[in-house]
């Protein structure tokens, strides 16, 4: 990062090294001089990258090419001062696939504007592939096999090893469906973390847990700098402050109590039926009780962390918000220590069964929490240094018409470490400007909330009774 600002005139500069469209006829058309805008989307809840490119089509390429949705887009974009291969957007070899021509609109002078949508090649491979075989090994190895063999991907793969030997019988399903099974059931080998995510960012494919993502060192520190603070002592632009300045921000989400109850974020019950021993067991998940045994965005920071809820009794019996397991699960399993439903070539049973009690409730709580956690959308100047799945620091300014006794500089909740859930990259070649719109989230507080002992849910002490009413028909 120290080298990031050296040689830049201002934040958001980029170098468009290559932009070639390979037509279905084999003709290669250079687009560097024709691009009006280029957009790339990366998201930790999307398996592949997608994007759109807007071009000034003076040659009526959409017609004469023609562009029919079977083209390849070769891209290579970099921040001028960044030389590390994993910090360069390089799709010159693993080209994008153009999926559709979304718009052709005539402009003055006989030209036209065309908008093309594209995606990673692996998405197209998935749509035309079927898996109909038995897969064995750890879930992380099965995912790698899907990626390398069935999706024929040669991109970098960041893999966190998972535990135990498993067996998946794939009945004519696509590779992403196999990956989805592995993603939902895998436990990390080192930490038994069930929060695996499979996604593609600008560096490659990832099969990693939320805990692994949270353990990363923050890439950048975003804050809002007044105009006078974005220059150095000599009056020149301070590039790092320019890059890390919050141009715009919107607080987009906060905890949703009703959703968290119904989705099982706060609490859930699970009945696991063992079809081998004809027995069943009950398991209860409690968000408050489990909080400090799980990993959160700020678990790897220097400050203490607290649940994303106020831990106070809501009735005289002392129940808190996590004492109501409204979400119910019913899951089967096969055997205590082995999966007796499948055997290897030597008629042994080396595969461990699916144990939903180890993963399902915890995983579901974390995945659903990502929808209702503390989220903020920020607009900043672009750089190829950060990608979806990274950790950044972000401090939203305190906003209020009065000054508190603490004289806060930053918002009490929206500060510290955040996970990048999604990024929209916009490249404007005419202005040589790269901007990013990022969705950041965090699932913990950095300070405890005051929890008075008798702050119960208010309700009337007396019932107002029931009024029974009838009505007369009109004689039909």
Q: Where do the protein language model's features map onto the residues?
A:
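An acidic/polar, Gly/Ser/Thr-rich interaction patch typically located in mid-to-C-terminal regions
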Residues: 40-66, 229-476
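Short beta-strand-centered interaction patches in the first periplasmic/extracellular domains
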Residues: 113, 120-122, 158-266, 282
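Assembly/oligomerization scaffold segments
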Residues: 1-128
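Sec-exported extracytoplasmic/periplasmic mature domains
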Residues: 147-152, 183-188, 394
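Extracytoplasmic/secreted envelope proteins and their assembly/folding machinery
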Residues: 140-144, 179
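N-terminal export/assembly leaders
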Residues: 126, 143-170
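Envelope-exposed proteins and targeting segments
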Residues: 17, 49-51, 71, 92-94, ...
